Amino acid sequence: MSITRRSFLGALSGFVSFGCQAVCPNPDETFDLIVVGSGVAGLTTAVIAAESGIRRVVVLEKQPLLGGTSIICEGNWSISETIFQKYAGIIDSNDSFYEDMLIAGRRTNKPELVRAMIDAGRQQFEWTVAGGVRPTAVGVNSGLRIPRAHKFNPVEVISHLRQCAKKLGVKIQTAVRVEELLGNHNSGVLALKSSKAPTNYFTPNILRKSWSRLVV
């Protein structure tokens, strides 16, 4: 998957969210990137961030186990023009996928965003498969005319992402509920208040790293 550190960090900038507070306490731990939630999106963010050169990354999960709602989903991933479709004798195209998405959205969706989703989904799919995780079947999802829903085992995907994160030095903490984001409109997120002692406060390393972000 071809992602530069600059493009990755630029993409993260749209996910910053915080509540305004006048004062932030001294943090117990400081990280360059704090990811809240350990589902597929959260763990993938942490892994790609670490691969992109961000050194101190932490994932906070409020449940005692990893996975979030990803662990209980059906595991269907709709992607067009894959080698798995070819092996199954399925003829598909990105244009057909695009048209199906427009129909499903009653043509109220933005065409450029649909194209972006299809392209980005393919990149992420290929990145996952290259890591050794394979779909077990290809079927039809609701709203799609052609079998392009690649069935994955959610437990296997989460386990794979966890192993990748650990190898890259990502710190993972479970049973940590994020209660409050502390900061202001001028400086952004300055600290994160959690529910787990003794580490009650985390903070993005914004004093030394101007590109730090917090992802929720």
Description of each model-found segment:
Residues 1-15:
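N-terminal secretory signal peptides and thylakoid transit peptides that target proteins
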Residues 13, 36-41, 66-67, 74:
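Short glycine-rich loop/turn motifs that provide flexible caps or phosphate-binding loops at active sites
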Residues 18-25:
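Bacterial Sec-dependent signal peptides at the C-terminal "C-region" and cleavage site
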Residues 27-32:
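A short, charged/proline- and glycine-enriched loop
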Residues 36, 206-216:
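Short hydrophobic core segments
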Residues 56, 62-181, 186-188, 195:
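Conserved N-terminal/central alpha/beta ligand/cofactor-binding core
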Residues 182-210:
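Conserved beta-strand-loop-beta-strand element in the redox core of flavoprotein oxidoreductases
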